[in-house]
C-alpha cells in the first residue's frame, strides 16, 4: 500500500487557496480539490479546460544505506507537469507526460540527519502544447495530481540500472544489462525458478545459475543461455517464471538482487499472414480499457486490476488495449492470467513533438519491455502518432523488436481500421490482402455495440485467414463520483465511455452476449425432440487447448411457470463426455439420458476450462411452449386460487398489487416508479419509453379497474401507440 497523507495546496476550484491534507496517490478532484473538466471541452464554444496547479509537501527521513549507496526517487505517474524539489533544491528537469514512470537520483540532496522535505509542483495543463494535444484534448476525463505511487530505492554505487530479458519459447534467454558505476571486475549471476512451484530451471549443461563478467561503467553487457524443460507462456496456459539477477562485487559478495517475472514465449508478425504466438496464429478477442475507478478517477489498485482482468477473462477475451501505458500492476495481471496487451504511447488525436515523444517512448518501453503479455507497441491513436519516432520502439526493445502499429491506420502490413462497416471497403478486410485487426469496433454506447451484432461481424471476418482479431470499445462506464456535486456519478452526458460493465463493474447485457459468442467451446444448434439420445455437436475454438482438457456437465431442470414464483428444481445432473478435439475441430459430445429426462423442462449444459473455471453455459428447452403451457396449466389455476389483487389511483400514484407483487406507476406520466416482489425491489423503473416514435400519455382517458381475478391499469396514448394494458393476476 503506497498511500500516504501529504500536505497540499490547490490554486483554483474546490478547497483552493489554503494548505490542507491529501492522500497520495490520488487525482486531486476526487479528493475534493480543483475543478472537473471533460476532455471534449473544445466542442463547446469558448470553453477552456481547468488549469489549476497543485503543490505537494512530504517530510521523510533518509533511509538507512551504505556510504557509497545511491538513493533514487521514483514517480509512477503525475498529471501533468511535475517540478520536483528536495530540501529546496531541484531534483532534476521538470517532467512532462502523465502516464510514464520517471526518477531522480537525490543522494546529494538529502540530509544525513533530520527530516527531508519533498516538494512537488504539479501543473494540470502542461507548458508543452504537444503534451496537451496528445493527452488533454481527448475523449476522457482530465484529472490532475500525483495519481500513481511514489517511492524511494536504495542502490549500491555499482548497480544494475536497467535490464532486458528476452525469454523465448525454445528455452533460450537473451539478456542485456545496463550498469551504473564502475562495474569492472563485477559478476552478474542469473537463475530462474518456477513462480508456482519454486523449482529451479537448469541450463542444457545442467547448471542452475549462469554467471557473466560485466563491462565498465555506462555500458551494456549482453549474454545468452538456454534452459531445459521450459513450459511456454501462452494465453491459455500462462506459465510464469522468476528470473533472479545477482550482482556480485570483486570479492564475490552479493551487493544487489533484482527479480523479474518472465514468460518463455515467442511473438512474431508476418505480413500477409498474421500474428503468431509460439508458432501458432493468434486471433485476439480483445477490449479497450482505461485505468478508471469511480472513487479514484485515474488512480486504481492491484485489487482493481485483478478484478478487471478476471472480468475480461470471464467474457472469454484474451487481449486488452488502452490509450496509454496502464498501471504496471494491470500488466502483471495480464501476465498471470493470460491476456495479451497492446502497449500504447498516448496520443488521442494529437501527437507529442519529436523530442518529447522520444523521451516518453523510452520511459514506456523500458518499464514494460519484459512483460510477456505485451505483444505489440502502439504509437498513438487515430492520427496521434509521430512517425519520426516509429523506429525508437525497436531501439529500446532491441531483442524482440515487437511490431509497431498506428491504430485506425493501415500501416506496415497491419490494417487496424476503426469501426468498420460489415462490408468495409474495396481491397480491405475480407476483401483485402493484408492482415487486419480493428483496434476499435463494436462501440458499446447504449449497448448498440458490444455483444450486439458481434456474431455477424466476427463470423464474416473469420472467413479470411488474415483476420487477426479485434478490440471492442469499451470495457467500463467512466463516471467518477463528483466531490463537488454531492457524490453524483457523472458521465458528462453521453460523452464519457459507455462500456460493457458499469462504473462499479456491474455486468450489463453485452457482458453475457460477448461471453457466449466468444466462448472457446461452442455448441452447434440443438433442438431436443423425442429422438434426442444425449449426443450433440461441439466445436473447439481454443487456440492451444485440446477439448479433452475441459469438462462439461448437464442438469435436467423442472421449471414451474413464472407466475408460481418458484425456483427451478434439478431432476438429474451428471458429466458430459467431451471428444478429444484439437483447436478448430468439431465432434460429438454425449451423455446418458437419465430416467427423469422426459419429466424435465430444460436441459442446462455448462463447460469448464482446465482450471475449473466456468467458460459458458447454455439452456435448451426439452419441450416447446405449447406442451409446456398445457402441462403447467393446472398448476397455474391451483396457484392462483385465493389470490387477492387490488388497483388504486390516488392522483399521484397508480398501484397494482397482489399478495406477492406490487407495481407503482406515476399517475402524471404513466411510467413505472418501482416494482416490489415481496420486500425486494426489482430494478425496473422509468419506462416504458418510446423508441423511434412519439407517444403522448393521456391521463384523462387512462383508467384502473379490478375484479376477483385481476387488477388492470390501461394507459392511453396519442401517437405511435393507442394504449398499453398492465394486468396483474
Put a short name on every predicted segment:
Residues 86, 172-210, 533-577, 589-590, ...:
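Beta-strand-rich binding/interaction modules
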Residues 4-41, 617, 651-727:
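Acidic-aromatic substrate-binding/catalytic surfaces of carbohydrate-active enzymes
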Residues 1-40, 121-130, 195-197, 201, ...:
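Accessory carbohydrate-binding/adhesion or oligomerization-edge regions at the termini
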Residues 303, 309-312, 319-505, 509, ...:
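Substrate-binding/catalytic cleft of secreted carbohydrate-active enzymes
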Residues 6-14, 23, 29-31, 78, ...:
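Substrate-binding clefts and catalytic carboxylate motifs of secreted carbohydrate-active enzymes
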Residues 10-13, 27, 31, 51-160, ...:
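Accessory beta-strand-rich segments of carbohydrate-active enzymes
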Residues 31-62, 66-75, 79-86, 92-93, ...:
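Active-site-adjacent substrate/metal-binding segments within catalytic domains
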Residues 111-115, 178-270, 597, 604, ...:
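Extended acidic/polar, glycine-enriched regions
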Amino acid at each position: 500500500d503506497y498511500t500516504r497523507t501529504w500536505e497540499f495546496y490547490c490554486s483554483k476550484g474546490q478547497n483552493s487557496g489554503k494548505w490542507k491534507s491529501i492522500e497520495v496517490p490520488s487525482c486531486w478532484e476526487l479528493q475534493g480539490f480543483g475543478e472537473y473538466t471533460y476532455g471534449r471541452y473544445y466542442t463547446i464554444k469558448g470553453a477552456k479546460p481547468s488549469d489549476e496547479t497543485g503543490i505537494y509537501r512530504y517530510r521523510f527521513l533518509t533511509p538507512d544505506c551504505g556510504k557509497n549507496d545511491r538513493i533514487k526517487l521514483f514517480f509512477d505517474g503525475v498529471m501533468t507537469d511535475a517540478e520536483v524539489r528536495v530540501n529546496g533544491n531541484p531534483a532534476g528537469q521538470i517532467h512532462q507526460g502523465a502516464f510514464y514512470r520517471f526518477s531522480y537520483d537525490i543522494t546529494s540532496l538529502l540530509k544525513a540527519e533530520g527530516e527531508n522535505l519533498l516538494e512537488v509542483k504539479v501543473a494540470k495543463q502542461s507548458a508543452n502544447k504537444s503534451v496537451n494535444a496528445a493527452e488533454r484534448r481527448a475523449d476522457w476525463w482530465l484529472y490532475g495530481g500525483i495519481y500513481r505511487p511514489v517511492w524511494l530505492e536504495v542502490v549500491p554505487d555499482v548497480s544494475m540500472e536497467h535490464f532486458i530479458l528476452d525469454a523465448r519459447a525454445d528455452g533460450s534467454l537473451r539478456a542485456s544489462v545496463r550498469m551504473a558505476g564502475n562495474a569492472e571486475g563485477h559478476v552478474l549471476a542469473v537463475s530462474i525458478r518456477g513462480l508456482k512451484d519454486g523449482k529451479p530451471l537448469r541450463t542444457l549443461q545442467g547448471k542452475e545459475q549462469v554467471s557473466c563478467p560485466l563491462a565498465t561503467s555506462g555500458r551494456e553487457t549482453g549474454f545468452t543461455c538456454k534452459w531445459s524443460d521450459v513450459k511456454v507462456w501462452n494465453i491459455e496456459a500462462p506459465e510464469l517464471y522468476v528470473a533472479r539477477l545477482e550482482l556480485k562485487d570483486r570479492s564475490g559478495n552479493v551487493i544487489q538482487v533484482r527479480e523479474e517475472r518472465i514468460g518463455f514465449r515467442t511473438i512474431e508478425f508476418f505480413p500477409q499472414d498474421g500474428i503468431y504466438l509460439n508458432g501458432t496464429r493468434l486471433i485476439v478477442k480483445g477490449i479497450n480499457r482505461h485505468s478508471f475507478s469511480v472513487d479514484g478517477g485515474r488512480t486504481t489498485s492491484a485489487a482493481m486490476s485483478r478484478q478487471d482482468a478476471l472480468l475480461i477473462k470471464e467474457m472469454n477475451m484474451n487481449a486488452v488495449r488502452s490509450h496509454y501505458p496502464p498501471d504496471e500492476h494491470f500488466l502483471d495481471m495480464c501476465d498471470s492470467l493470460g491476456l495479451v496487451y497492446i502497449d500504447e504511447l498516448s496520443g488521442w488525436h494529437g501527437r507529442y513533438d519529436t523530442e518529447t515523444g522520444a523521451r516518453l517512448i523510452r520511459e514506456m518501453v523500458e518499464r514494460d519491455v519484459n512483460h510477456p503479455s505485451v505483444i505489440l507497441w502502439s504509437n498513438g491513436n487515430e492520427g496521434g502518432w509521430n512517425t519520426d519516432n516509429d523506429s525508437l520502439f525497436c531501439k529500446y526493445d532491441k531483442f524482440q523488436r515487437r511490431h509497431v502499429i498506428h491504430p485506425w491506420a493501415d500501416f506496415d502490413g497491419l490494417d487496424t481500421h476503426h469501426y468498420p462497416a460489415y462490408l468495409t471497403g474495396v481491397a480491405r478486410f475480407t476483401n483485402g490482402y493484408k492482415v487486419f485487426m480493428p483496434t476499435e469496433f463494436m462501440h458499446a454506447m447504449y449497448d448498440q455495440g458490444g455483444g450486439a451484432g458481434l456474431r455477424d461481424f466476427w463470423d464474416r471476418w473469420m472467413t479470411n485467414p488474415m483476420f487477426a482479431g479485434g478490440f471492442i470499445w469499451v470495457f467500463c462506464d467512466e463516471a467518477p463520483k463528483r466531490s463537488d456535486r454531492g457524490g453524483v456519478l457523472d458521465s458528462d452526458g453521453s460523452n464519457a465511455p459507455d462500456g460493457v460493465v458499469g462504473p462499479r463493474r456491474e455486468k450489463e447485457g453485452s457482458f453475457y452476449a460477448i461471453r457466449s459468442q466468444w466462448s472457446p467451446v461452442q455448441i452447434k444448434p440443438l433442438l431436443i425432440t423425442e429422438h434426442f439420445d444425449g449426443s450433440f455437436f461441439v466445436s473447439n475454438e481454443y487456440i492451444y487447448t485440446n477439448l479433452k482438457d475441459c469438462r462439461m456437465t448437464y442438469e435436467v431442470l423442472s421449471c414451474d411457470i413464472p407466475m408460481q414464483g418458484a425456483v427451478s428444481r434439478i431432476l438429474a445432473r451428471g458429466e458430459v463426455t467431451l471428444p478429444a478435439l484439437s483447436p478448430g475441430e468439431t465432434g460429438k459430445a454425449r451423455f446418458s439420458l437419465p430416467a427423469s429426462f422426459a419429466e424435465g423442462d430444460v436441459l442446462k449444459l455448462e463447460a469448464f476450462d482446465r482450471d475449473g473455471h466456468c467458460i459458458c453455459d447454455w439452456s435448451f428447452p426439452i419441450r416447446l411452449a405449447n406442451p409446456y403451457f398445457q402441462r403447467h396449466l393446472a398448476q397455474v389455476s391451483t396457484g392462483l386460487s385465493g389470490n387477492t389483487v387490488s388497483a388504486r389511483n390516488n392522483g399521484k400514484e397508480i398501484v397494482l398489487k397482489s399478495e406477492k407483487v406490487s407495481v407503482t406507476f406515476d399517475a402524471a406520466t404513466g411510467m413505472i416508479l418501482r416494482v416490489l416482489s415481496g420486500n425486494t425491489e426489482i430494478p425496473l423503473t422509468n419506462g416504458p419509453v418510446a423508441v423511434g416514435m412519439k407517444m403522448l400519455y393521456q391521463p384523462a382517458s387512462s383508467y384502473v379497474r379490478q375484479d376477483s381475478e385481476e387488477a388492470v391499469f390501461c394507459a392511453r396514448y396519442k401517437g405511435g401507440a393507442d394504449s398499453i394494458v398492465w394486468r396483474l393476476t
